[in-house]
Curated annotation (Swiss-Prot):
It comes from Brucella melitensis biotype 1 (strain ATCC 23456 / CCUG 17765 / NCTC 10094 / 16M). Transmembrane segments: none annotated. The lineage of its organism: Bacteria, Pseudomonadati, Pseudomonadota, Alphaproteobacteria, Hyphomicrobiales. This is 31 kDa immunogenic protein. Pfam families: NMT1_3. Residues 1-28 form the signal peptide. InterPro entries: TRAP_TAXI. The gene is bcsP31. It comes from the Bacteria. NCBIfam families: TRAP_TAXI.
Amino acid sequence: MKFGSKIRRLAVAAVAGAIALGASFAVAQAPTFFRIGTGGTAGTYYPIGGLIANAISGAGEKGVPGLVATAVSSNGSVANINAIKSGALESGFTQSDVAYWAYNGTGLYDGKGKVEDLRLLATLYPETIHIVARKDANIKSVADLKGKRVSLDEPGSGTIVDARIVLEAYGLTEDDIKAEHLKPGPAGERLKDGALDAYFFVGGYPTGAISELAISNGISLVPISGPEADKILEKYSFFSKDVVPAGAYKDVAETPTLAVAAQWVTSAKQPDDLIYNITKVLWNEDTRKALDAGHAKGKLIKLDSATSSLGIPLHPGAERFYKEAGVLK
């Protein structure tokens, strides 16, 4: 009986030990899932998101241990912010102006409430304001858009709000132009056919559709500069100066303009240590190599501009890393 009791005690102990070991192993191996909302698969956000997701995932020795990051295609800035707010995404890419409006409840988010938990993880690269004009339209400045047929992009887009800000700085409203509200693709086709004089587009240069227009029809880019640009920069923290270099588009001269920024945002509810570790891996040498080799815009993602265009607060975890790295005081 004693021998049997001893066997039973050993068996119970062994089972308990196995359960404990299994539980500790499960805890050690439990993955943390971290989704990055991007944009359409044909755009820039999606491939950049894929590069970053691969870099920060903890599959090897170079990522965040236990982290499983994935790039998720989406409808872009507004959709990503709304999904972060609802908890459907842990993070996402957005234009800096859209992030600013969401956080402050203005612009596109006027009357929709503030997204007060929105936090910045990193500013990535500039997204340039293009005012694309027909070469024969004789549009030399924004003021020359008066009375012209101009597409401002669709209602609900970030571009249309940017366009209105630019027009206002030059003393114009939509009533002063023959405004149309087309996506960039249809706007380019209308311009090509002579049914449109100019259109606004926000994105990195060179972009394929505008390059094709420059080759097939000839275009000019309308500058945004001088006191009007300074007025915009003073009023809106999410804008910065930019220049489209000569040759970015066929036979188009260097053009001063403004830009917003592509930003990686998350929620204040994400753990500080997690965001700290993600930010740290984002800026290590291996991620640098992956970004440089993986996409043209990857080369523009730099640590020294990671905290620029601060229209919303940094996540505390990201802020801790940037202070350690000397980017923030």
